[in-house]
Amino acid sequence: AGEDHGRGPYVQADLAYAYEHITRDYPDAAGANKGKISTVSDYFRNIRTHSIHPRVSVGYDFGGWRIAADYARYRKWHNNKYSVNIKELERKNNKTSGGDQLNIKYQKTEHQENGTFHAVSSLGLSTVYDFRVNDKFKPYIGVRVGYGHVRHGIDSTKKTKNTLTAYHGAGTKPTYYDDIDSGKNQKNTYRQNRSSRRLGFGAMAGVGIDVAPGLTLDAGYRYHYWGRLENTRFKTHEASLGVRYRF
């Protein structure tokens, strides 16, 4: 609100720091949905990340109560995972002219995952009440309904092959044979790209400080629950600093 306690339309621009948190919500192993296949990959379980993003709002100040529509875009989250698992399949002692030779056969499995998660945008409508402590200092609280758009994708490749290591005895270097059973090699590729739109709810609190007629400095916090994204739940905590101008 402006310094003159008047009413009128306003615009607001904020820079927000968002803490983004995804938690798992899998079907009960003994429940009715135990066989349900997840469409949000296990890759995205328990993500905790953050982003800095702009937010713009337009609203109307009724002289105590305010309503506003806001729009924000968030940063895309990237992560890569690579793992190798080596399992012994068999070992044999072979007699050679040079002595004993130990051959050990292994199965090598490589797993590469590349994932992205993007809270693309949030369009919200909020109702806010300003507490008029004095002519300059106005704490506020509010509630918000938001329509959020989230995209997530994963590109996973799993390769399995057999190798052989021959140990020739003490003091000699072992010999490594790569890909000894090419006919038994396996390569599994899994790609998933999803887009979800959900209606969520949140709350906000902060303080406005009038610095000039019609111009207010705003420092705020807001929590938003984006809704259930298949087998996960997504929420954000945001701290913001901005300016509001009432016409």
From Swiss-Prot:
Gene3D superfamilies: 2.40.160.20. It comes from Neisseria gonorrhoeae. SUPFAM superfamilies: OMPA-like. GO terms for cellular component: cell outer membrane. Keywords: Cell outer membrane, Membrane, Signal, Transmembrane, Transmembrane beta strand. InterPro entries: OMP/PagP_b-brl, Porin_opacity. Its main location: membrane. Belongs to the opacity porin family. Coiled coil: none annotated. Residues 1 form the signal peptide. It is found in: Cell outer membrane. This is Opacity protein opA52. Pfam families: Opacity. GO terms for molecular function: porin activity.
